[in-house]
Structures are given as structure tokens and as C-alpha cells.
Amino acid sequence: MSSGTLYDKVWDLHRVAELSGGSTQLLIGLHLIHEVTSPQAFVALEDKGLKVRCPERTVATVDHIVPTTNQARPFADPLAEEMLSTLERNCSKHGIVLNGIGSGRQGIVHVIAPELGLTQPGMTVACGDSHTSTHGAFGAIAFGIGTSQVRDVLASQSLAMNKLKVRRLWFDNQLSPGVFAKDLILHVIRSLGVKAGVGHAYEFAGPAIDALSMEERMTLCNMAIEGGARCGYVNPDQTTFDYLKGRPSVPSGGAWNRATRWWRSLASNADAVFDDELRFDAATISPTVTWGITPGQGIGVDEQVPTPEQLDPADRPIAEEAYRYMDLTPGQAIAGVPVDVCFIGSCTNGRLSDLKAAAAVARGRQVAAGIKAFVVPGSEQVARAAEAEGLDQVFRDAGFEWREPGCSMCLAMNPDRLEGRQISASSSNRNFKGRQGSASGRTLLMSPAMVAAAAVTGYVSDVRSLGD
């Protein structure tokens, strides 16, 4: 059993009661909601005559269904308009802050909460969204929940949970130039599999993690769920504090000093006992690209699609399915695979540093003929910051479209979708069949810099080969 870990400390601080069957009633410090998984929860709440227990601990935004080209109301899609209108009514009725379009604070829920200083070390964070693990980058314990659990948190500000095991993933050395946190987490999922983390929290640690920016740590924790982990986290350190200082909702003055002292104490003890520990050499990781239909089917850009003989027998059936669906041949080099669409954005990679990395590749180059390439900032704040630095013009000059914030082509819940058998180079988090809107569309996951490299060449390319 793990002992002395950050996970243990945060768990113990938020325990309300031990329940029959071995679960624990856990206080939720921050509840994030959006337009997709909250409507049914509010209906269920009102059917029972209940009110939102802690509206001050509940924060809303709109992200999944918003168009990224024309955000004028009413939306062209009547269902999207109804979903947003419903969220607006529910938030108004229950006194919940809604960061709506044009507020200067709207964006993808897992982008705006950190930039507003809402996510802080030692918190428990819940949201009706799979990628809530993003917030673990701050030393929080954060997890996605279903609609019925959204109802429970609205009603009680608590949740019945089973305690997880804690696996520490230690990364020696440093990532090489042209290799990013996205490559690191795709490498982990490739190495361990998409189910390895079931029943676990992942603690990411080691010299390579210490060197990551907060935005890269968010990318890392965002995709812990794709490796089966319920949550992933990084111990809070000076990098965390430097990011948080001065943001709204964060303590200031003397309270700031007290907060940072307490936050430091939450880090896993030097003698912490983990249920499991695995080590990786960050220096050996290459830019990574998925070739199949799960995030675990990834390879280095300088590798070939694996043959069935190279795979574990248990992985061969899904590989055979992936070969057929993706129209890829075992042994085929992933570099050189042509793409149709290039998407930079999502809660995984829609932050300012992501856009800077992609813009560095796009600057002075042109999107290849026949390629549709577009950039969707993760929030209104990201968009305005990028525009202030001229990144939007860099992308436009290169032939990319510059869009308004939203989840966009990460998922098929808004107008940004693949068509037919199009294949996309995408900085998002899932490459499942149909994920990007077309039942036969294909997705190659990679870092924003790699997406930009694919956009200007027209095919999967090693960003390191393009130089400055």
C-alpha cells in the first residue's frame, strides 16, 4: 500500500466518512461543469427538490459544442444553442459563475481553470469530462466523473470513491530538442498499454518531469487517463508556484507565503512507499506518432508500423483491425504517410506554449497544397495572448486558419469534423474510430510541432529534420 505520497495526503485531507463496501465519501474542492454532462444532472437535482450545495466551489464554461468560426448567437446548430441556453439558465438559477463566450475567460474547461488560478495544489477536482486528470499537474487529485456523479457533487459537494493504488513513473535524464511532453506520454502509453493504469493514480517524477513547464505537465497529466489511470499528478514545486502567483483566485500577500509553505508539504515524502515504480529514460524518447486506433498504438517517427510478430499475442487482434482501418501496412514507415487535415488545439495541446512550438515550425513556411490546417486556441486568454505576440499572423501567413476557442476537432460535437476517409495529424488525445466526426475518418496523434511539420510537408515528418 502506498504511504506518504501526495495522493495519500490529499485523500486523507478530504475524507468525510468511510462507507459500507470499502468506499470513502470524499469532499470535492472544485467542481467544473460544462454544457454536455451537466443538463441531466441539474434535472435530476431538481426532480429531488435539491439545490446546489456549494455554488461557490462550482465553475462553468462552454467548450464542447461551440463553433470555432462563427460564435454569434444563436448558433446555427439548434441543439448546440439549446445546450448552451440550458447551461446559462442552470447557472443563473443556482448562482454558478459561467465563463461564457466573450467574457474573456471562456475556453476549454481544462485550460481555463488553471489559467484563472482555480486549480491549486492539494485540491480534489471533479468534472464530467474524461480529461480532468489534467489538473493533477498542480499536485491536485483530479478525475473525470459521469453525469450521475455530477448530480451527486452538485447536491453534496462530495463523492463516493474507492482509493486507488499509486504507481510512480520516474523519468531520468532530459527530453531531447524537438521532443515534448506529448511524446513522453504517448511513449508511456505505448510502453505500458491502455489498461495498465486501471485502479491506479500515476505520479510523474524525476529530472525530466522537474524540467517541464506547467503547460507541458498539464499535457502529461491530461493523457494519464488514456493509459488507464484514473488520475495522474506531479508534485508541486517552484515551477508550480511561479505559474500560479498573481492569478485570480490565488492567495496573495502573507496568505501566498503560507499557501506555498503548505503546498510544498504536500509533495510525496522522500521515503514514500509506492505500490509500484517504473523507470524511463527520457533521453531515448523520439517524436511519437500513433499509427492505429488507440493511443497505445504509437511509434517513434523514425520507426515502422509494427508487424504482428513484433506484438504481444494479446495485442494482435486490435492491431489487425487497425491495419485495415488505417490503410497501413505492417513494416511501413510512419514518416511519409500523407495527411489531409492538420489540427492544432484541444485540452491536451491548446495552450500558449503549444502554439509557440507550432508557430516556430510554421514561420517562413507554407501549408502544403491540398492540406487543410487550422489552429484553435484553448481559451480566449490563450487566443488574445497569442495574438499579442503575433502568432496568429505567423499561422495565417503560412496558410493556417486561425479560429476561436473551443474543443473543435478533438471530438465530433461541433462543426469541425473530418469528412469521409480523411486522415488528420492532430494534437488532441484520442484516435478512436469516428472520434473526429467521420465514421471512417482516421487520426494520427502527435505534438503540435509535429502537426505543424505535417502541415507544411503534407505528410508525417520528423520535426527535427526541419531545423529552425
UniProtKB/Swiss-Prot annotation:
InterPro entries: 3-IsopropMal_deHydase_lsu, Acnase/IPM_dHydase_lsu_aba_1/3, Acoase/IPM_deHydtase_lsu_aba, Aconitase_4Fe-4S_BS, Aconitase_4Fe-4S_dom, IPM_dehydratase_rel_enz, IPMI_cat. The gene is leuC. GO terms for molecular function: 3-isopropylmalate dehydratase activity; 4 iron, 4 sulfur cluster binding; metal ion binding. CDD domains: IPMI. Its cofactor is [4Fe-4S] cluster. Its EC number is 4.2.1.33. Keywords: 4Fe-4S, Amino-acid biosynthesis, Branched-chain amino acid biosynthesis, Iron, Iron-sulfur, Leucine biosynthesis, Lyase, Metal-binding. Belongs to the aconitase/IPM isomerase family. LeuC type 1 subfamily. This is 3-isopropylmalate dehydratase large subunit.
